[in-house]
From Swiss-Prot:
It catalyses: (S)-malate + NADP(+) = pyruvate + CO2 + NADPH; oxaloacetate + H(+) = pyruvate + CO2. Belongs to the malic enzymes family. CDD domains: NAD_bind_1_malic_enz (cd05312). NADP(+) binds at residues 182, 296, 325-341, 437. Homohexamers and homooctamers. Divalent metal cations. Prefers magnesium or manganese. The record marks D296 as: Important for activity. This is NADP-dependent malic enzyme 1. GO terms for molecular function: malate dehydrogenase (decarboxylating) (NADP+) activity; metal ion binding; NAD binding; oxaloacetate decarboxylase activity. Its main location: cytoplasm. SUPFAM superfamilies: Aminoacid dehydrogenase-like, N-terminal domain, NAD(P)-binding Rossmann-fold domains.
Amino acid sequence: MEKVTNSDLKSSVDGGVVDVYGEDSATIEHNITPWSLSVSSGYSLLRDPRYNKGLAFTEKERDTHYLRGLLPPVVLDQKLQEKRLLNNIRQYQFPLQKYMALTELQERNERLFYKLLIDNVEELLPIVYTPTVGEACQKFGSIFRRPQGLFISLKDKGKILDVLKNWPERNIQVIVVTDGERILGLGDLGCQGMGIPVGKLALYSALGGVRPSACLPVTIDVGTNNEKLLNDEFYIGLRQKRATGQEYSELLNEFMSAVKQNYGEKVLIQFEDFANHNAFELLAKYSDTHLVFNDDIQGTASVVLAGLVSAQKLTNSPLAEHTFLFLGAGEAGTGIAELIALYMSKQMNASVEESRKKIWLVDSKGLIVNSRKDSLQDFKKPWAHEHEPVKDLLGAIKAIKPTVLIGSSGVGRSFTKEVIEAMSSINERPLIMALSNPTTQSECTAEEAYTWSKGRAIFASGSPFDPVEYEGKVFVSTQANNAYIFPGFGLGLVISGAIRVHDDMLLAAAEALAGQVSKENYEKGMIYPSFSSIRKISAQIAANVATKAYELGLAGRLPRPKDIVKCAESSMYSPTYRLYR
């Protein structure tokens, strides 16, 4: 695969004339008719975010579609509109204000929203998604304006198929669904977790090029155990404690069956921010019957593995020679560990069980060891190794002597000065990944990692941090952001018509991402490529994933494209305005 080495490139994969959805790929070469239930015109056209262009409507379009007098006389092109909006957004003092401004734009002018996001992805990504989306979910009831997805609740049991049919789009390719029980590191936010599927799917379109009309955000509302929300007069969800057990399982099963019945075999269902006990169970239950993906387990694992594979060039040692210690043994931690073990098993030509022996996990009760096995949850048991009990992280570091420290605990500042110094005393180049988000939950900051390691740490985080200067050298830490992986991963599934997700596809995605890191990136201390080239990166990931789907016999779109990278690029949604007949 060809590397993307120019970190200053705009994310400008424009899409081709005909995309994978079998229609015009939003290019300006073809005039189109703004169909709704009827041809939109006049005031209704200005109110339709799919077709509204604001002041960019041409003189001819204003006459043809009865817009004369409904707009000021000036005609502004999309580039100038984008410049004006970016200036306006930069005037806001607080990230949540910027988030609300972007949401309002998305609801008013869809193409301008995506054009702005694609062209300014590094600046706006922390606003559209983590960390700002966490605050937006906490205050979702207060800032709610209009629905952007489907809300399915216990009240809809027995009629979920009818609810799905209420959604106006029929050709759905990607669904992101949450039950709101574990939103980022913020806990149970109930129905207000809808901000997560909406934000994730905005990135599927902006970064991965999946058409917005093919994306469906869904919240499954089974109640909330958050007393603050239950007592909030502006809370928008069911005011009851969470349903569990059979009642919960039956609702989810009805949803999964209805999705398959309504949208077919090839629709991707991404589980998002489910609590650990449900996340693993749902993935295991439906992975053989549906095209399912859990970003918290599989997406996080793939992006972290990519960083570790990339870092091999800085540590000068293969992954199989490393020893890993995790703080956090939930869905993220165990998912990452499992994918690392799979990768090492292929690298060493050994069994996954043998590879697991190089990976240790610490949970709230200390190091996971064999003597604790009877009391462990099932998903933790494969990581229980023979060792005497160790109560805390620092003790585990001294006992295990890891070369890689990975945090997925959700406990802010748990990588203390003593922890970083201990890692630095063991390793010349300690590899430290503080993955928890939002920023307040990060195990340490970039400044702490570089300062306490005396500039020797190789560092990546789950939340964004500013560059750090230490003893005259500037270190640019990179964010191990799932947004590197899931948009391109999803696009790869779409263009191949995949019917199932296989672990080898996750490895393929990780290898594709690692292959995009340039020499210039490494010199700055980065183990991930610049986000400014994310669309080109996503195309490479999509091509790798699609190729693997064809190799595994899981691709349903035949014949196989001759040039899969070109196919991925030409399938991408373009937000450039179209001319109307």
